Every structure is written in structure tokens, then in C-alpha cells.
UniProtKB/Swiss-Prot annotation:
SMART domains the record matches: t_SNARE
Gene3D superfamilies recorded: 1.20.5.110
Domain of life, per lineage: Eukaryota
Membrane topology label: Peripheral membrane protein
PROSITE patterns named in the record: T_SNARE
Stretches with biased composition (Polar residues): 100-130
Keywords associated with the record: Coiled coil, Golgi apparatus, Membrane, Protein transport, Transport
General function of this protein: Involved in vesicle-mediated protein transport between the Golgi and the vacuole.
Protein name per UniProt: Syntaxin-like protein fsv1
Pfam family, one: SNARE
Gene, per the UniProt record: fsv1
Main localization of the protein described in the UniProt heading: Golgi
Organism for this UniProt entry: Schizosaccharomyces pombe (strain 972 / ATCC 24843)
Length: 247
């Protein structure tokens, strides 16, 4: 289906650019006719595939209707392209006297016959005319849209987008889990550091109390020495004698 869409888009663009190519001295008619022939062959294959789908009871009805709607849509686009091609050829083949070259040139007339749709495609279109209204109600076509998107293609694109979003969400979830584990590890480390700081504060308080106690003793000794200077000198000399004697 995608190949057929590409071919129709390509031949439609060639038809639109036909006049510009003729101005540069090129003749794209043979290439356009070949492309139109390829489109008819692809439509013939789709017509045969549609017949097989309709005969297969295991195929869901919506699948058959989607395929039929796509086939009708492509047939209409082919007819529109052929009509535009014929209009341009008629316009470019009318000489100054107003007579048409198609009536005088049998080769051009035979080429005209090549552009008629295949009988099998005419049969498919006529057999599906009764369900055109239903098909258009189920799959409305925007007249301004040159390339309507098939429902299956749209569903596949939507599913692919959902899968990509799911993968992205999975990556985000894994990243959040890693950050969560890192947060737990940092919390544990901070708790250990808090315990260590508490122990250091306790040790500092204990040392400070010892210094205060020693300071109080020194102050007490200093007051005693001021009250009894002679006794203090005697005690100091005795301490020195004991120290010398021990050496």
C-alpha cells in the first residue's frame, strides 16, 4: 500500500510539473504513461487481494472494509490524475487554428486508449458504488488532503509512539529508582556523620569539664599560696627535694 501511495504521489507531481518540463524542451509524457501503467498494475493486485479477503471468512469485516475503502480511494486518485493529464495534453496539442491534434494523429489516439482504466478495476469500482456512502461515513476524506492516511498505518504509528513513550517512561523510572537509592545512601551517611559529631561534642564537653575542674584546683592553690606564702614556699622546696632525691 505504501508503494502504491508513493507511485501515485510521484506521478501526480510529474503531471503538475509537466508544463514546466515542456518549457525546458523535455517530454515527460512517456514517463507519466509508464507510471500510470504501474499504478494500474498495483491496483489490479490490490483488486485481486480484495477478492481473496472477501472470500476468506476468517478475515474480520473491518479489515475487509478498510481494504475496500483504500482501493476505492486509490482508484479515484488514479482517475483524477488521468483526467488532469488528459486536460494538459489536450491544451498543449490544440494548434493555432483550433483543431485538435488527437483527431489527426492516430498515435496519440492509441495512447489515449492506454489511459482507460482496467476492466477489473471498473468492476471493482462499480461493485463498491453501493457502499461508497458507508465507506465515506466510516473513513471521511478531507478534500484538501492529497494523501489520506490509512487507518492501519495510523494505528501502527500510534502504537509505535506508545511503545517509545513506554520505553522513555521505563528509563525515567529506572533513573528515579537510582536517585532514590542514592538518596537512601546519602541519608545513611549523613546519619553516621551526625552520630560522629555527637560523639565529638560529648568528648569536647568532657574535656572542657576536666579543664574547668583543673582550673578550679589551681585557683584554690593560688588562693592558699596568697594566704600562706611561707607555707607554700616550704611545700614547694620539699617537693623539689623529693624530686631531686628520686633522681
Amino acid at each position: 500500500m505504501s508503494n502504491l501511495l508513493l507511485i501515485i504521489d510521484s506521478v501526480s507531481q510529474k503531471i503538475r510539473d509537466r508544463r514546466k518540463l515542456e518549457e525546458f524542451g523535455q517530454n515527460p509524457d512517456e514517463e507519466i504513461e509508464s507510471s500510470l501503467k504501474d499504478v494500474r498494475q498495483e491496483l489490479q493486485k490490490l483488486n485481486e487481494e480484495q477478492s481473496r479477503l472477501e472470500k476468506n471468512a476468517q478475515i474480520p469485516e473491518y479489515r475487509v472494509r478498510e481494504s475496500e475503502a483504500f482501493l476505492i480511494r486509490m482508484q479515484r486518485r488514479l482517475e483524477s490524475a488521468e483526467e488532469e493529464f488528459e486536460k494538459q495534453r489536450r491544451a498543449s496539442s490544440i494548434p493555432a487554428d483550433g483543431t485538435s491534434a488527437f483527431s489527426a494523429n492516430p498515435q496519440v489516439a492509441s495512447t489515449n486508449n492506454k489511459l482507460t482504466p482496467l476492466p477489473s478495476l471498473q468492476k471493482t469500482t462499480s461493485s463498491s458504488e453501493g457502499s461508497d456512502i458507508e465507506m465515506e461515513a466510516m473513513y471521511p476524506v478531507d478534500g484538501n488532503d492529497p494523501d489520506p492516511i490509512n487507518v492501519n498505518v495510523l494505528a501502527q504509528m500510534h502504537q509505535q509512539m506508545l511503545n517509545e513513550q513506554e520505553e522513555s517512561l521505563g528509563g525515567i523510572e529506572a533513573s528515579v529508582q537510582r536517585q532514590k537509592r542514592m538518596g537512601y545512601a546519602m541519608n545513611t551517611e549523613l546519619s553516621e556523620q551526625n552520630v560522629l559529631l555527637d560523639n565529638m561534642n560529648n568528648d569536647a564537653d568532657r574535656i572542657e569539664r576536666r579543664f574547668d575542674h583543673a582550673k578550679n584546683r589551681l585557683n584554690k592553690v593560688s588562693r592558699k599560696a596568697k594566704q600562706y606564702p611561707r607555707c607554700f614556699i616550704i611545700l614547694l622546696l620539699c617537693a623539689l627535694l623529693l624530686l631531686v632525691a628520686s633522681i
